[in-house]
């Protein structure tokens, strides 16, 4: 399983997304309504779930690597869920006071939008893996 995980993560450059699927029962979905128009979802670890980290790359609109971010997810199930879903929930906290809830994905690009003062959300749309 570890070898498969390594191959899946190493063979493709992953961009990040946000989705309403929280992956294999280890997370609970939370719905967030933004500007009374759009509904977004993020996922949070259930109490007692161990958080683990993984580094993934963000792509720009030209499908080029923009930067790397460290995603924190709940156990191994989060990453394996990404490869079948293809979404999996993750929490990223770059500032220490604004948690950011993402889902990593394969074969998708991302767009960024501001949800509220607590976190930034990133949503996926169909695209190619960036080089």
Curated annotation (Swiss-Prot):
Tell me the first and last residues of the signal peptide. Answer: 1-19
Can you summarize the PTM annotation of this record? Answer: Contains 4 disulfide bonds.
Q: Where in the cell is it found?
A: Secreted
**What GO molecular function terms would the record report?**
ion channel regulator activity; toxin activity
Record carries keyword Cytoplasm:
no
Q: Which residues are processed away as propeptide to yield the mature protein?
A: 20-38
Q: What does this protein do?
A: Probable neurotoxin with unknown target. Possibly targets ion channels.
Q: What is known of its domains?
A: The cysteine framework is C-C-C-C-C-C-C-C-C.
The protein here is known as: Conotoxin Cal8.2
Q: Which organism is it from?
A: Californiconus californicus
């Amino acid at each position: 399983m570890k070898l498969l995980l390594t191959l899946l993560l190493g063979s493709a450059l992953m961009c990040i997304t946000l989705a309403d699927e929280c992956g294999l029962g280890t997370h609970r979905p939370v719905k967030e309504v933004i500007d009374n128009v759009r509904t977004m979802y993020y996922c949070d670890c259930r109490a007692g779930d161990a958080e683990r980290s993984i580094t993934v790359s963000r792509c720009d609109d030209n499908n080029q690597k923009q930067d790397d971010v460290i995603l924190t997810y709940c156990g191994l199930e989060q990453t394996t869920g990404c490869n079948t879903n293809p979404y999996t929930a993750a929490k990223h906290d770059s500032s220490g006071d604004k948690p950011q809830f993402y889902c990593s994905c394969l074969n998708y690009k991302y767009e960024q939008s501001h949800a509220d003062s607590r976190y930034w959300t990133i949503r996926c749309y169909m695209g190619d893996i960036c080089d």
